[in-house]
Design a protein with these regions (language model features):
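Short, charged beta-turn/beta-strand-edge "cap" motif at the junction between a beta-strand
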Residues: 33-34, 72-79
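Contiguous, well-ordered beta-strand patches that form the walls/edges
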Residues: 32-39, 43-46, 54-57, 105-111, ...
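Bacterial N-terminal signal peptides that target proteins for export
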Residues: 1-7
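Short nucleic-acid-contacting surface segments enriched for D/E, G, S/T with interspersed K/R
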Residues: 57-72
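Tryptophan-anchored aromatic micro-motifs
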Residues: 91-108
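Edge beta-strand at a domain terminus
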Residues: 79-93, 132-138, 175-188
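C-terminal motif of bacterial Sec signal peptides marking the signal peptidase cleavage site
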Residues: 15-18
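Structural detector for short beta-strands of small beta-barrel domains
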Residues: 20-37
Length: 188
């Protein structure tokens, strides 16, 4: 009888284990919140917060708000699901910061672009060229910068393609493809 109970219990446990879905899955979206142990990701399916406590974050690139992200997990997609890996596009993290060049009018000054999280941008000391937003272009190192030019009398909206590069000394540059302007990323 005891042996029969043990067999029934073993079969029941095997059945429960077989029913749990531990196949690896991924959830891709945009980071809307992040902390030391969680990341909240939103896409068309909804918004979910994942535990990142034991996740591989070697490709997380700072988990910046607005960054495109892929979260790998197992089991059911639910609030608090444990992530096994979190990866973002490195171009997003490389882009965020102040990009400047010497100001040709003021030899002691600089001008440039401040690229911020969540797709926001601002001009630095450029009154007639106002950057407002940016987005990844989908190719490594490529961005689209958007704003308004007021230099010719009436405001004209613009979109520029820019390329991020890193030289052998680790210095990042941002080159505007339409005019060849080269900005250097400020150390922060």
């Amino acid at each position: 009888m005891k042996r029969m109970k043990i067999m029934v219990a073993a079969i029941a446990l095997c059945g429960l284990a077989a029913c749990s879905d531990n196949t690896p899955k991924s959830f891709t979206g945009t980071i809307t919140d992040a902390s030391m142990n969680t990341v909240t990701v939103e896409n068309a399916e909804g918004t979910f917060t994942f535990s990142t406590m034991n996740a591989d974050k070697s490709e997380a690139n700072g988990l910046l708000l607005g960054a495109p992200v892929t979260v790998n997990y197992s089991g059911k997609l639910e609030e608090g699901a444990a992530a096994s890996k979190v990866a973002t596009d490195p171009t997003y993290a490389e882009a965020v910061g102040n990009w400047t060049m010497p100001d040709p009018i003021d030899p002691d000054g600089v001008m440039g672009i401040r690229i911020m999280v969540e797709g926001e941008a601002q001009s630095i000391n450029m009154a007639t060229l106002r950057y407002a937003s940016w987005e990844l272009q989908g190719e490594a190192g490529k961005l689209l910068l958007k704003g308004v030019s007021e230099g010719s009398g009436s405001p004209i909206e613009f979109t520029e393609t820019a390329t991020i590069a890193k030289d052998a000394d680790g210095i990042y540059t941002l080159t505007i493809e339409s005019n060849g302007a080269v900005y250097t990323k400020a150390n922060e």
